[in-house]
Amino acid sequence: MLMPKKVKYRKQMKGRMTGTPQRGVELAFGDFGLQATECGWLDSRQIEAARIAMTRYIKRGGKIWIRIFPDKPLTSKPAETRMGKGKGSPDSWVCVIKPGRILYEMEGVTEEVAREAFRLAAHKLPVASKFITRTEINEG
């Protein structure tokens, strides 16, 4: 699973999922990409599940880049614990996703293969996303 090696602070505030991303909105490596169209949190398990779905479909052809990283700790309190007594301990890691953020990139395969691989990956993710190509970005 993806997680930071070391963090400055063990726990973080929840925050608000508003606005648009400042970076990570254009294809940087591949010819095709999966772009988020709504905001949400992606768990490290969900990121990995989508990656596995894509790699299994494209088999040995092509290259995949993961453009997101879970760097926000989620805390949880143990089951059957009374309220109060402070914030819970870090439980899992999430990545904050805003609309327009590129999640994955791919190259070395045809557009049909890439489109189907990203469709399979999108089913594993809790945020709505769309398929984009490098030519669409250059034209628009």
Swiss-Prot record:
Keywords: Ribonucleoprotein, Ribosomal protein, RNA-binding, rRNA-binding, tRNA-binding. Transmembrane segments: none annotated. GO terms for molecular function: rRNA binding; structural constituent of ribosome; tRNA binding. GO terms for biological process: translation. CDD domains: Ribosomal_L16_L10e (cd01433). The keyword Transmembrane helix does not apply. Belongs to the universal ribosomal protein uL16 family. Binds 23S rRNA and is also seen to make contacts with the A and possibly P site tRNAs. Part of the 50S ribosomal subunit. HAMAP family: Ribosomal_uL16 (MF_01342). This is Large ribosomal subunit protein uL16. The gene is rplP.
